[in-house]
Amino acid sequence: MKKIEAIIKPFKLDEVRSPSGVGLQGITVTEAKGFGRQKGHTELYRGAEYVVDFLPKVKVEVVLADENAEAVIEAIRKAAQTGRIGDGKIFVSNVEEVIRIRTGETGIDAI
């Protein structure tokens, strides 16, 4: 099993959460703030300058079977891409075990 974590721009969430042709069982979405190469930026508010160090992002997490990982990664990449700095990152890691709390199911059946 794989866990895919994608850090994306918030306005891309609707496109990422329902990629066409990929049967996702479910996702977890978390609001986040951060910066990468683009760093922050300066904003002017009521005549005063403010440095915005952390930019709003959304973290999307999906756990799925190994054989579905590449298709989901590509679907997320295509949906989240704007071609501009700050599009985000996708992290892929192995998941050793999944347990559904309600039923006690384990492994791929628990997803």
UniProtKB/Swiss-Prot annotation:
Work out whether the entry's keyword set contains Transport: no
Instruction: Indicate yes or no for the key word Transcription regulation.
Output: yes
The Swiss-Prot or TrEMBL record annotates one GO molecular function as:
enzyme regulator activity
Per the UniProt entry, what are the Gene Ontology biological process annotations, in alphabetical order?
nitrogen fixation; regulation of nitrogen utilization
- O-UMP-tyrosine modification sites are 50
Q: Which Pfam families match?
A: P-II
Q: Record's GO cellular component, any one? A: cytosol
- Which key words tag this protein in UniProt? Nitrogen fixation, Nucleotide-binding, Phosphoprotein, Transcription, Transcription regulation
Q: Which family does it belong to?
A: Belongs to the P(II) protein family.
Assembly behavior: Homotrimer.
**Function, in words:** In nitrogen-limiting conditions, when the ratio of Gln to 2-ketoglutarate decreases, P-II is uridylylated to P-II-UMP. P-II-UMP allows the deadenylation of glutamine synthetase (GS), thus activating the enzyme. Conversely, in nitrogen excess P-II is deuridylated and promotes the adenylation of GS. P-II indirectly controls the transcription of the GS gene (glnA). P-II prevents NR-II-catalyzed conversion of NR-I to NR-I-phosphate, the transcriptional activator of glnA. When P-II is uridylylated to P-II-UMP, these events are reversed.
Its name, as the record gives it, is Nitrogen regulatory protein P-II
Q: What is the lineage of its organism?
A: Bacteria, Pseudomonadati, Pseudomonadota, Alphaproteobacteria, Hyphomicrobiales
